[in-house]
Amino acid sequence: MSLIEGDSIYNLFQTQDLGIDFASSIVPDSPNKFKKNANVFNNFQQQQQQIQQQNKQSNGLIYNNNNNNNNNNNNNNNNSSSSNNNNNSSSSNNNNNSNNNNQNHNNNNNNQNHNNIQHNNAQSQVYINHNSNGSQQEEQLFSIYLQPEKENELNNSYHDNVNNNNNNNNNNNNNNNNINLNHAQQQQQQHHLPHGQPHNNNNNNQFYQIKNPMEEIYSSNGIVPNQEPNKKVEYMNEPIKQNHYNIVPESIFDVPFGVSSQTMLNVPSTNNANNNNNNNNNNNNNNKNINFKQPIQPNQLIPIPPHSNQNNNISLNNNNSNSNSNPNNNNNNSNNISTQINNLNNNINNQNNQLNGSNNGKKKEEDKSIKKRKFISSTPVKGENGGTTLIPTTDGGFNMDEERHQKRQRRLVKNREAAQLFRQRQKAYIQDLEKKVSDLTGTNSEFRARVELLNSENKLIREQLLYLRNFVTQAVSFSFPKGGSNGTNSPSGVADQFLNSILPPGLNSPLPQGILPAGMNLQNPMIMSAIAEAASKNSTFRQNIQGNLLGTPIPSPQSSLTSNSGNNSPNKPLNNNNNNNNINNNNNNNPSSPNNNLNNNNNISPNSSTSHQVPYLPQNTPPQQSTPNQR
């Protein structure tokens, strides 16, 4: 893993306890990678040679000088963490003071911008592994910690100087040379360190008690390094992973760590952001902050804070100005950060709960309002097939005007539907009545036709009966025999026999009285000849006679009368009681004489109603037949 910016890391870990993981895994990048700015590290290399000489005397201690310039006073305080004896540490401090004074003087005169590599925090403590050959030190480091395919992807981005730790109002830039132990050398020099004794702490840069590097140094941030100094750090603390880290699984990709961490933490950018710089000096220390674009290895822990919707007003920079550095201050700072983070998390949870509660309350109110609605009416809607369906309507009670409008529309629809149904029923009723009237009219016309037919038949029957009655009367009067008191020889008996012979069986009813004169003999050939002559002169009569002779039944007068009375004919039947056939027999002495018969036939009483009751008889009556005596 390559160098990570100290600013982003220290923004996460404000105390020194949380930043001790740089001891074994994080190293500065090589200056040879930046050919354009190769002179930046010249002073650093000179200091490195002096440190190597000093390390031979102090059992391999390594120093990293962090120089801050001042126009008025250049107080170079060398803070040594541990040494074998006080003489060696004091001598090394004196040597470093002399060298640092020269370097600071050159930097102030020439306005050089690269006095040291500042990662936005003066407390960024960089540990360098020591080797006997100082020239090969950086090559070995980068061969171990950098991958060859990622070396060409390193970038150096320059930002304005952000010196968060120059808090001296006295215009004094105290250049504190913070000397920290390497992990391997700290194990060798544990018995030489003063327990719990901090050194010169003008800018809150201090050494602290180191009892056990596996317990004390790494206990605060949960980082457990390997025993070998040249291997990477393995993070084993699971709760810290859950709270502050995400693991990138089995992938390598490049992320500018400084930019990504600042955007995730809502930390303001470092451009022109001098948060705690209260110096009134005129020194333009344009120290370039070099941000490295580094590859993220698989299973690497990326610091990600808890999500927050509010502006995190937590100052993650070191704002300790002119304060006495004590171990308790570090604990207080860490406690403050943890409490602030907890407060933010609580606020977020409260807001989420409020939002969820408000949403749930609204849903419950809507559900209650829906449950309170009742189906107060049903709206008839005309379907596609011509039928109507009833759709239930709900009363929400939200808007009175809208509700009134809906009621009015429902009422109009009901009225229209009722009117339509009434018109349909009325039309069906009228059509039924019209059909009945048409049927009755047809039957009435049929009955009228039948009545006319019956009237015409009745008229024809009357004409035939009246016409035949005259002929029969005349024939009987001519053939009435003389004397003969027997019943068989009487005219009535003969007429009955003749009629019975002519009429079909079942119609042999006795003839009415008064049709034939008494004593008329129908067996007389003269009577038969008279009937035949009359029939020859009248075609209708001839047809009737032929029908009778051939066996065709001729209706009797009674049947014709009953048929006329059954048909309710308006024309009343003839009155058979008229004495039209009553012949006045003046000659009672000679009733059988032919002359008297002729006279009797001709002398018809004038009171007879023949001419009145039968006005439609034909005028061309058959002529009277002559008697044999007249021949």
Swiss-Prot record:
Molecular function GO terms recorded: cAMP response element binding; DNA-binding transcription factor activity
Location relative to the cell: Nucleus
Pfam families membership: bZIP_1 (PF00170)
Low complexity bias spans: 155-206, 271-360, 563-609, 618-631
Annotated region (Disordered), positions in chain: 46-117, 154-207, 264-406, 546-631
Stored InterPro entries: bZIP (IPR004827), bZIP_sf (IPR046347)
Residues forming coiled coils: 35-62, 328-366
Residues covered by the bZIP domain: 405-468
Keyword terms: Coiled coil, DNA-binding, Nucleus, Transcription, Transcription regulation
UniProt record similarity statement: Belongs to the bZIP family.
Protein name per Swiss-Prot or TrEMBL: Probable basic-leucine zipper transcription factor F
